From Swiss-Prot:
ATP binds at residues 202-209. One of its GO terms (molecular function) is ATP hydrolysis activity. Component of the 19S regulatory particle (RP/PA700) base subcomplex of the 26S proteasome. The 26S proteasome is composed of a core protease (CP), known as the 20S proteasome, capped at one or both ends by the 19S regulatory particle (RP/PA700). The RP/PA700 complex is composed of at least 17 different subunits in two subcomplexes, the base and the lid, which form the portions proximal and distal to the 20S proteolytic core, respectively. This is 26S proteasome regulatory subunit 8 homolog B. The 26S proteasome is involved in the ATP-dependent degradation of ubiquitinated proteins. The regulatory (or ATPase) complex confers ATP dependency and substrate specificity to the 26S complex. There is a cross-link at residue 406 (Glycyl lysine isopeptide (Lys-Gly) (interchain with G-Cter in ubiquitin)). Its main location: cytoplasm. SMART domains: AAA. Pfam families: AAA, AAA_lid_3, Prot_ATP_ID_OB_C. The keyword Cytoplasm applies. Belongs to the AAA ATPase family. InterPro entries: 26S_Proteasome_ATPase, AAA+_ATPase, AAA_lid_3, ATPase_AAA_core, ATPase_AAA_CS, NA-bd_OB-fold, P-loop_NTPase, Prot_ATP_ID_OB_2nd. Keywords: ATP-binding, Cytoplasm, Isopeptide bond, Nucleotide-binding, Nucleus, Proteasome, Ubl conjugation.
């Protein structure tokens, strides 16, 4: 039986053994390096989590600290004794002020060292300590939110160039409104008092409101517009309070113009009546308005414009000089004025050549400025209806017929009034 042969391996040399040892060490080093890198990534992730938690806790701590400070201040205010609320009447000296406290009366009080006396103007609301009556705090003005809504934030964009046929009225209103605001030194040099109020009266649609907006634009004043019907309130005393706060806001934003439209709704003549149907509240509102007109000085740069189409029913106490210093009438435009108004309202329209606006003005005898503007609008609507991009003479004639047709018997009584 033959023996199986076994292949003999060559003997391992020292060099080969060294290489094997180095290879095993390299593999072991790569494993350790990978392990340490993974461990390092894990530690970095933990460090980021801890930093995030630390920042979150610091933010919570800051928020809690601010709440604690706020609560401490609130607690301190609650622990302080209450104060009386008063109104400054007059500054008596360097550290004395005459204050009116309701319902107790008027007192001359000391001023705290922390109060700037230059801020203590008449009608300023202040707080007095209940033990020593020392003035220690200046309070903000209390104004009804409804009154704040009456203030027009944006300066009106109406100008004198947009008003036609009212050259004389523009001249008169410039003298009593614009000139005192821009050049008060002229009145001081002459030694005359500045006018306080102006009444604009005339039929509807003759440009009273438009002229008031133009005055506010050219004088760059705060324009406060209020309708007389807004001052007629349901509860007793509410209308009077709104009138007071209206003038307080006007003083704060001086120079300012208060424009009261439809003044006949609160300024009608008083009659003896015990019916209790709400007329007494309207009369209280008018009396407060008269008081405010008498109370503020003309040098405060507060001007009052009033507009109405029923001057015949206004109370004579409202119309007397010193309250209303000038009355400006706004009649319906004549033929030349109607032509000027038509040119103003049609200058941006795409008109065909040969349109005779003077002929249109002749046909609209007795029309107001609002009706003339309506004619231009209706003429454009007739052109739009026929898919044209220009307005013709026929469009204007049709517009005149349509607008003037509305002037029927229901308006005759008003026209007879203004003849």
């Amino acid at each position: 039986m033959a023996a199986v042969g076994v292949e003999a391996r060559p003997p391992v040399t020292a060099m080969e053994e060294t290489c094997n040892v180095k290879g095993a060490a390299a593999k072991q080093g790569e494993g350790l390096n990978k392990y340490y890198l993974q461990h390092l990534d894990e530690l970095q992730r933990l460090q980021r989590e801890k930093s995030y938690n630390l920042n979150r806790l610091e933010a919570q701590r800051n928020e809690l600290n601010s709440r604690v400070r706020m609560l401490r201040e609130e607690l301190q205010l609650l622990q302080e004794p209450g104060s009386y609320v008063g109104e400054v009447v007059k500054v008596m000296g360097k550290n004395k002020v005459l204050v009116k406290v309701h319902p107790e009366g008027k007192y001359v009080v000391d001023i705290d060292k922390s109060i700037d006396i230059t801020k203590l103007t008449p009608s300023t609301r202040v707080a007095l300590r209940n033990d020593s009556y020392v003035l220690h705090l200046v309070l903000p003005s209390k104004v009804d939110p409804l009154v704040n809504l009456m203030k027009v934030e944006k300066v009106p964009d109406s100008t004198y160039d947009m008003i036609g046929g009212l050259d004389q009225q523009i001249k008169e209103i410039k003298e009593v409104i614009e000139l005192p605001i821009k050049h008060p030194e002229l009145f001081e040099s002459l030694g005359i008092a500045q006018p306080k109020g102006v009444l604009l009266y005339g039929p509807p649609g003759t440009g009273k409101t438009l002229l008031a907006r133009a005055v506010a634009h050219h004088t760059d004043c705060t324009f406060i517009r209020v309708s007389g019907s807004e001052l007629v309130q349901k509860y007793i005393g509410e209308g009077s309070r709104m009138v007071r706060e209206l003038f307080v806001m006007a003083r704060e934003h001086a120079p300012s113009i208060i424009f009261m439209d439809e003044i006949d709704s609160i300024g009608s003549a008083r009659m003896e009546s015990g019916s209790g149907n709400g007329d007494s509240e309207v009369q209280r509102t008018m009396l407060e308005l008269l008081n405010q007109l008498d109370g503020f000085e003309a040098s405060n740069k507060i001007k009052v414009l009033m507009a109405t189409n029923r001057i015949d029913i206004l109370d004579q106490a409202l119309l007397r000089p010193g309250r209303i210093d000038r009355k400006i009438e706004f009649p319906n435009p004549n033929e030349e004025s109607r032509f000027d108004i038509l040119k103003i309202h049609s200058r941006k329209m795409n008109l065909m050549r040969g349109i005779d606006l003077k002929k249109i003005a002749e046909k609209m005898n007795g029309a107001s400025g609002a009706e003339l503007k309506a004619v231009c609008t209706e003429a454009g609507m007739f052109a739009l209806r026929e898919r044209r991009v220009h307005v013709t003479q026929e469009d204007f004639e049709m517009a005149v017929a349509k607008v003037m047709k509305k002037d029927t018997e229901k308006n005759m009584s008003l026209r007879k009034l203004w003849k």
